[in-house]
From Swiss-Prot:
<dbReference type="GO" id="GO:0000287">
    <property type="term" value="F:magnesium ion binding"/>
</dbReference>
<protein>
    <recommendedName>
        <fullName>Ketol-acid reductoisomerase (NADP(+))</fullName>
        <ecNumber>1.1.1.86</ecNumber>
    </recommendedName>
</protein>
<dbReference type="InterPro" id="IPR008927">
    <property type="entry name" value="6-PGluconate_DH-like_C_sf"/>
</dbReference>
<feature type="active site">
    <location>
        <position position="107"/>
    </location>
</feature>
<comment type="function">
    <text>Involved in the biosynthesis of branched-chain amino acids (BCAA). Catalyzes an alkyl-migration followed by a ketol-acid reduction of (S)-2-acetolactate (S2AL) to yield (R)-2,3-dihydroxy-isovalerate. In the isomerase reaction, S2AL is rearranged via a Mg-dependent methyl migration to produce 3-hydroxy-3-methyl-2-ketobutyrate (HMKB). In the reductase reaction, this 2-ketoacid undergoes a metal-dependent reduction by NADPH to yield (R)-2,3-dihydroxy-isovalerate.</text>
</comment>
<comment type="pathway">
    <text>Amino-acid biosynthesis; L-isoleucine biosynthesis; L-isoleucine from 2-oxobutanoate: step 2/4.</text>
</comment>
<feature type="domain" description="KARI C-terminal knotted">
    <location>
        <begin position="182"/>
        <end position="327"/>
    </location>
</feature>
<feature type="binding site">
    <location>
        <position position="48"/>
    </location>
    <ligand>
        <name>NADP(+)</name>
    </ligand>
</feature>
<keyword id="KW-0521">NADP</keyword>
<dbReference type="Pfam" id="PF01450">
    <property type="entry name" value="KARI_C"/>
</dbReference>
<dbReference type="InterPro" id="IPR013116">
    <property type="entry name" value="KARI_N"/>
</dbReference>
<feature type="binding site">
    <location>
        <position position="52"/>
    </location>
    <ligand>
        <name>NADP(+)</name>
    </ligand>
</feature>
<feature type="binding site">
    <location>
        <position position="194"/>
    </location>
    <ligand>
        <name>Mg(2+) 1</name>
    </ligand>
</feature>
<feature type="binding site">
    <location>
        <begin position="25"/>
        <end position="28"/>
    </location>
    <ligand>
        <name>NADP(+)</name>
    </ligand>
</feature>
<dbReference type="Pfam" id="PF07991">
    <property type="entry name" value="KARI_N"/>
</dbReference>
<keyword id="KW-0560">Oxidoreductase</keyword>
<feature type="binding site">
    <location>
        <position position="251"/>
    </location>
    <ligand>
        <name>substrate</name>
    </ligand>
</feature>
Length: 344
């Protein structure tokens, strides 16, 4: 059974008196920085001059260049996109990693796949809320918290675990619970979930269903409603109470169809290919391909992105969403929450 840690189990004093550098001020960066600041920790944000620099300054956070923040901080949390971390680390962070400092991440990609190799005399750990930054911020402001993961890669000082837990408490994650894992487990399961189910699996399933109905002569608008629009209703039910709650909530006809048709779509051959995807993640094949893609200027990434944007389902969906203002209101609410949370 997984070990969970909550606020009452954690002493944050180990992190008090230390300066924490948040590198990056995007969705996660602004949430971590502001939550830590309001929890009484000494925070500095390290970003390049420009929009994020000005935004952090306007929020009342101490802002420096990445190199300056890394130099003066005791704990350095890198909240940049995976593909940018190595270059920024080597140029602006590594020169200032003195013995006894701590290097943090919110995802284990660059450590696990050897893109970043910190010196042996620094602590290395991750703390990863399981939700987007605007939700991490909103839950914190409401007195709740998004649950998170933490893992230790190096414990040079003997305090790495205590520091990770204190950091998790500072951003509000310990209110929801912090689950202990490893860099390997966090990285591989996160990538697998994205590729096989949450992003890759879901988008291909929706697209195939939409195309099947349209090619059979049904109106694209109805196909969109039945394969994409209503997906949120089903996922919300599963999110709230698991598959059993979803099946309880839908009609008996829908539930019966789930049982008899579902295994015809997602059968053992699909599971076998999922295992192939997992193997590519575990042996580094996916990581090497993604690293090479970035080094080459992202030609395949751009091609895939353009093809997806030009699919008929996007055109149909855009027109239908214009007829449903409540959807745009929800989208605008998220944007407002991000802006408001950064101001408060």
């Amino acid at each position: 059974m997984a070990t969970m840690y909550y606020e009452q189990n954690i002493n944050e004093e180990v992190l008090k008196g230390k300066k924490i550098a948040i590198i990056g001020y995007g969705s996660q960066g602004h949430a971590h920085a502001l939550n830590l600041k309001e929890s009484g920790f000494d925070v500095v944000v390290g970003v390049r001059p420009g929009g994020s620099f000005d935004a952090a300054k306007a929020d009342g956070v101490d802002v420096k260049t990445v190199a300056e923040a890394a130099q003066e901080a005791d704990v350095i949390q890198i909240l940049l996109p995976d593909e940018r971390q190595k270059a920024v680390y080597e140029a602006e962070i590594a020169p200032h990693l003195e013995a006894g400092k701590a290097l943090m991440f919110a995802h284990g990609f660059n450590i696990h796949f050897g893109q970043i190799t910190p010196p042996a005399d620094v602590d290395v750990f991750l703390v990863a809320p399981k939700g987007p930054g605007h939700l991490v911020r909103r839950q914190f402001q409401e007195g709740a918290g998004v649950p998170g993961l933490f893992a230790i890669h190096q414990d040079a000082t003997g305090q790495a675990k205590d520091l990770a837990l204190a950091y998790g408490k500072g951003i509000g994650a310990a209110r929801g619970g912090l689950l202990e894992t490893t860099f390997k487990e966090e990285t591989e399961t996160d990538l697998f979930g994205e590729q096989a189910v949450l992003c890759g699996g879901a988008t291909q399933l929706v697209k195939a269903g939409f195309e099947t109905l349209v090619e059979a002569g049904y109106q694209p608008e109805l196909a969109y409603f039945e394969t994409l629009h209503e997906l949120k209703l089903i996922v919300d039910l599963m999110f709230e109470g698991g598959m059993a709650t979803m099946r309880y909530s839908v009609s008996d006809t829908a539930e019966w169809g789930d049982y008899v048709a579902g295994p015809r779509i997602i059968d053992e051959s699909v599971k076998a290919r999922m295992k192939d995807v997992l193997t590519d993640i575990q042996d580094g094949t996916f990581a090497r391909r993604w690293i090479q893609e970035n080094e080459n200027g992202r030609p395949e990434y751009t091609k895939f992105k353009e093809a997806g944007a030009n699919h008929q389902i996007e055109e149909v969906g855009a027109k239908l969403r214009e007829m449903m203002p409540f959807i745009n209101e929800g989208k605008e609410k998220v944007v407002r929450e991000v802006a408001t949370s950064a101001k408060n």
